[in-house]
Amino acid sequence: MLVIVTENVPPRLRGRLAVWLVEIRAGVYVGNPSKRLREFIWEQVEQGLEEGNAVMAWSTNTESGYDFQTLGRNRRLPVDYDGIRLVSFLPPQDVDGVL
């Protein structure tokens, strides 16, 4: 299972993601691609992101049962805590430089 959530991305990237995944809500895509296709899809996100941000989560053989990666500016920062991936939240001013 793969889930990608996007914010403030160009319409062409949203259309591109809809080629391989189902957009179940604005900016939320799900599917069950192979690892190779998942990596290709993420490359498309990296190339088309512009000023937006995205997160991709997928099922895998880890202790938590999933893994994820992020791209772009947002308040959520992935951290590794004893082999478990967690999310740390930054204060709003750390993202934009202002309150």
Give the residues covered by each predicted segment.
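Basic nucleic-acid-binding interfaces
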Residues: M1-L99
